[in-house]
Amino acid sequence: MSNTPRNINDVFTRVVSVPASQIDLLSASLLIAAREYPDMDIVAERGRVALLGERVRKRLRRRHGLYDAVHAVNEVLFNDLGIRGDKKRYHDPRNSYIPNVLDRGLGNPITLSVLYVEIASRAGYRFHGIGLPGHFLVRAGEGSESIYVDPFDVGGLLSRRECIAIVQRAIGKPDRKSVPMSVDEAAPFMRPTGKRAILRRTLSNLKQIYLEKEDYARALQVAEGIRTVEPTSWHNLADLARIQTELGRFNAAAETLSTYLARAPRGHELESARAALSELRNRVIRKRESGPGTDAAGTGGPVGESPRNQ
């Protein structure tokens, strides 16, 4: 019998509807996977991560330094389990689901980083995810003692200057190679990423993947998840309205666009949004005039078979 709750969306809402610092990141991440794999056993998956943390703890024994901890996590994840960053199929959605990462041994930067942080936590160490533009790392330690780890590159260590170079390349200033970005300029990009932001970034990656595949049913699930994590995200509301329209859910799309217009910054494609809202309302009127019927049922259940190990 599965230990995954039937009302996954309700449980996910409860898990993320607390102050960001109190969010159980592993539970929330597993619930994201459970929306795709409703037969997944969340208790068992938590147990897998706990066992990995215990293996790290045993490796450390009497050693307690940060480098010792990083080395131990690296050994367990990348040597024992053989986990790697998926550089061939980077945008495979399975790379975003922790159970898939453990099953297949492949993941993307943010999911590998979440797994890294959660394993370290269960071994007694507080590491942080660092969401650089275009990449995701793990930081062990604080201030000048910080160690930067790249789980996507089998736990390779990076200097602060190498991290700054990643930021500089990502924000489009390659012309400044001869004038490197300063530590102060890069500092806002190198702060620990909050749990809510990590979840939003994970879901945003998935949303983009499904939109590119034109898999609007799955994209809808993910966009609804982002709305749960960050209800005020106007960018996600715009995407959500588009997805609802693609699925023929014109009433829902009109409501979403109305909310978007109330929240989006002035001048941000508001005229096109107003035109889209007017067209949606006309569609709703025509639909009512043509006969009974409502928008398709809401989300909440599985959106199709997607074997974890195919």
Enumerate the language-model features and the residues they cover:
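A structural boundary/capping signal
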Residues: 1-310
